[in-house]
């Protein structure tokens, strides 16, 4: 098995198998093939070559929400690589669509009133109020807010929406778990 060639859904679903651990994070097998697969998976995750482009962001957000307090750094590395792949895919698609719209606008006379908005000129607001936790949607809200923040050309910050709103600054180079912990 080549972890870099797996579909994003498969590598997320079977991440523990790929890393040769059981559900309690103990070594699953001492078989040399299982150990070699875990080493290939770790190398692929370290190189950010694990596919995540087609992931369901809600599923990924809920896994990140469960793992961010976990000490399994290898699993976090794999999930972070998948997040990076998903983010890169979103950014690329958004850039391509914006360029297409700008080209179309230019071909149609470049009327300033109809100029497409820059999708990167945004500030995220993340709802972290109690109702989000109660509705079990806080993890997806946080993940999507982080994605918008990382895409933004305005700055590396977002505003929390809660009883005590705050401005949170992120380092976009940090892994998703470090950024996630700033919100939770």
Where do the PLM segments sit?
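Long lumenal/extracellular ectodomains of secretory and single-pass membrane proteins
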Residues: 1-140, 150-184
């Amino acid at each position: 098995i080549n972890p870099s060639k797996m579909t994003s859904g498969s590598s997320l679903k079977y991440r523990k198998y790929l890393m040769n651990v059981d559900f309690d994070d103990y070594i699953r097998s001492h078989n040399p093939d299982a150990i070699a697969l875990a080493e290939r998976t770790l190398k692929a995750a370290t190189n950010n070559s694990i596919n995540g482009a087609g992931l369901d962001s809600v599923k990924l957000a809920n896994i990140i929400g469960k793992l961010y307090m976990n000490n399994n750094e290898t699993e976090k590395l794999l999930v972070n690589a998948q997040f990076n792949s998903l983010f890169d895919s979103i950014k690329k698609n958004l850039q391509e669509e914006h360029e297409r719209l700008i080209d179309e606008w230019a071909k149609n006379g470049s009327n300033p009133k109809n100029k497409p908005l820059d999708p990167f000129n945004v500030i995220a607001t993340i709802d972290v109020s109690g109702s989000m936790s109660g509705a079990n949607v806080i993890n997806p809200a946080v993940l999507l807010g982080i994605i918008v923040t990382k895409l933004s050309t305005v700055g590396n910050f977002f505003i929390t929406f809660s009883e005590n709103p705050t401005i949170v600054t992120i380092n976009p180079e940090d892994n998703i778990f470090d950024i996630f912990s700033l919100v939770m």
